[in-house]
Design a protein with these regions (language model features):
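Active-site glycine-rich loop that binds ribose-phosphate moieties when present
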Residues: 124-153
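Intrinsically disordered, low-complexity regions enriched in acidic/Ser/Thr/Pro/Gln residues
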Residues: 116-120
């Protein structure tokens, strides 16, 4: 069977996009995500994103995300910008789009060619919202976490999906392939966790790497970048109400923390190519 797809990327966080608005999500989507995401052997991607019919009145579409290991994710900040770009270039030419996700409807505003701003949900630092266990019931800000025999200071943030943020001196020297899985599968996070390692350049500029649950190290993570800026705002390192520039392996995202812990994320959404895969 032949499967038409669009390859898109936001800060090199690349996914295979399927138009499922009429057909629905393929029944074998988990296996399909594993097979097509395999780099060097297939299309290669961080996963598959299905563009579906909306479920909320007035919404323009729905996004469902399947990681490279076949698991379904709640939200992807880079992915939702690409869904907006895909809809915009496929007949939904509106400056503001609303897209349903597994963590609620997101409002996305076009800022220019291949540039979109996402109004993210309010973040939380409470363990019940991650979830996290064995870490108390209060805000998880600047808390000790023992991973592979080393004590790390972490701040845990939910932005619709769970993140663990830790500040390091030199992000480039980290061996994420060794430490990332230990964070992801830590016993304190029963549903696994995404982990961000961040180096502070100054109060408005950060450098970050991310280990995503279900995908491993990726070149960017929109929700992870939001969680990182939220965490550093909680720590008093970054100011609220100002644009914070975060450099990832795949490019730059700009995040702003608004009153009420709301977040704005601005970044690119680029179509790489369209293709057909034999499945």
């Amino acid at each position: 069977m032949k499967l038409s797809f669009t390859k898109m990327q936001g800060c090199a966080n690349d996914y295979i996009y399927l138009d499922c608005r009429a057909s629905g999500v393929p029944a074998d989507i988990a296996a399909l995500a594993q097979r097509l995401s395999a780099r060097h052997f297939s299309v290669g991607a961080d996963g598959i994103i299905c563009i579906c019919a909306p479920v909320t009145p007035g919404a323009d579409g729905r996004m469902r995300i399947f990681n490279a290991d076949g698991s379904e994710a709640q939200m992807c900040g880079n992915g939702v910008r690409c869904v907006a770009e895909w809809l915009y270039t496929h007949g939904v030419e509106k400056p503001v789009l609303t897209i349903d996700t597994n963590s609620g409807a997101k409002r996305i505003t076009r800022q220019g060619a291949q540039l979109w701003q996402v109004e993210m949900s309010a973040y939380s630092t409470l363990p019940a919202d991650l979830p996290a266990i064995h870490m108390g019931e209060g805000p998880l800000v600047d808390q000790p976490l023992t991973v592979e025999g080393k004590v790390w200071k972490v701040t845990c943030i939910s932005v619709g999906n769970p993140h663990c943020v830790t500040v390091v001196e030199d992000v480039d020297s980290l061996k994420l392939e060794a430490i990332g899985p230990a964070f992801e599968h830590h016993a304190n996070f029963p549903e696994r966790i995404n982990t961000e390692f961040v180096q502070v350049v100054d109060a408005a500029h950060l450098k970050m790497r991310v280990w995503e649950r279900g995908s491993g190290e990726t070149w960017a993570c929109g929700t992870g970048t939001c969680a990182t800026v939220a965490a550093l705002t909680e720590l008093g390192i970054c100011p609220a109400g100002q644009d914070i520039h975060v450099q990832l392996r795949g490019g730059e995202l700009v995040i702003r923390v608004l009153p009420g812990r709301q977040l704005l994320m601005t970044g690119s959404a680029v179509t790489v190519y369209e293709g057909v895969a034999e499945v």
